[in-house]
Design a protein with these regions (language model features):
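Non-catalytic substrate-recognition and accessory regions of acyl/acetyltransferase enzymes
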Residues: 1-183
Length: 183
């Protein structure tokens, strides 16, 4: 059974790894006390092909499971799949908080001028897309403008660009006010 190692009082204790112009945060989020699997939130900023000079990066995040010997168990790109492992709703909230904190660490370290992100799984339900909006809020809070831009073959695309000042948008206001879904 999954045991979350993140507590409400914990600050994100993770180092930003940097190499080949990529920035990575790998945060331990828990373990399975029956089979020994360890679970990490893996968050990466990688330069878009041909755009390194412009400081435009792609952001991706997932949950990765591995055995202590290093053998790979699985990678979960969205909540519809990770829910089978991380069952407790409170644990899921803590993990999402760790992902957002890791995104903030990467933005602070890389200082990208532009960021692009897309859903990994096509046709995600509204509840799953709201998590991307939560990650989007990290960008907005750090001085980026943007949000969801288009829908392509079931994938939602997001684009952000650094602006001179932090947005005055209320945290409760939808990022795309003209979108009836609010996301």
């Amino acid at each position: 059974m999954f045991r979350c190692t993140i507590t409400d009082e914990d600050a994100l204790d993770a180092d930003v790894l940097q190499g080949n112009d990529e920035y990575i945060v790998n945060v331990n989020i828990g373990f399975d006390d029956e089979v020994g699997t360890v679970y990490n939130a893996f968050v990466v900023l990688a330069p878009r092909p041909g755009m390194l000079d412009l400081r435009v990066f792609d952001l991706a995040f997932s949950i990765v499971g591995a055995q202590p010997d290093g053998s790979h168990i699985g990678t979960w790109w969205d909540g519809s799949r990770s829910r089978a492992v991380i069952v407790d709703p409170e644990d899921r909230i803590r993990v999402m908080g760790a992902v957002c904190a890791a995104v903030g660490c990467l933005i602070d370290a890389a200082e990208p001028l532009g960021i692009k992100m897309q859903t990994h799984t096509a046709d995600l339900p509204l509840k799953a897309r709201v998590k991307y909006e939560r990650v989007s809020r990290v960008f907005i809070d750090r001085g980026y403008a943007g949000g969801k831009t288009e829908h392509y073959h079931g994938l939602w695309l997001y684009e952000f660009e650094r602006v001179a000042t932090v947005s005055n948008v209320s945290p409760d206001e939808p990022l795309n006010a003209d979108d009836p879904e609010g996301i």
